[in-house]
UniProtKB/Swiss-Prot annotation:
This is DNA-directed RNA polymerase subunit Rpo11. GO terms for cellular component: cytoplasm; DNA-directed RNA polymerase complex. It comes from Methanococcus maripaludis (strain C5 / ATCC BAA-1333). Its EC number is 2.7.7.6. CDD domains: RNAP_L. It catalyses: RNA(n) + a ribonucleoside 5'-triphosphate = RNA(n+1) + diphosphate. Pfam families: RNA_pol_L_2. It is found in: Cytoplasm.
């Protein structure tokens, strides 16, 4: 089963669905995307969540939407943002 599904993709727009997640990762990705040059819109939406009986967490399938200007490739910006998040996690692990 995929954790990430591509809902829609073009040069300047990408929409992803994160399967069985909540606000945490979606909000982090959105915030990092908004700091990137060429980003016009970075947003996410979460339908009404349900309680996962196995974890006790409220989960849904949030969608992340990214729109960039004509000169900026949306997939490239998304990959840069995800790399920044991984780098931040690695830096935090080293400092612990």
């Amino acid at each position: 089963m995929n954790y990430v599904n591509i809902v829609e993709k073009s040069k300047n727009f990408i929409e992803l669905e994160l399967v069985n997640d909540d606000h945490s990762l979606s909000n982090l990705i959105k915030e990092v995307l908004l700091s990137k040059k060429g980003v016009i819109l970075a947003s996410y939406g979460v339908e009404h969540p349900v309680l996962d009986p196995d974890t006790g967490r409220y989960i849904s399938n949030p969608t992340i939407m990214l729109k960039t200007d004509e000169k900026t490739d949306a997939e490239k910006v998304l990959k840069e943002a995800l790399k920044d998040i991984v780098d931040l996690c690695n830096k935090t692990l080293k400092e612990l």
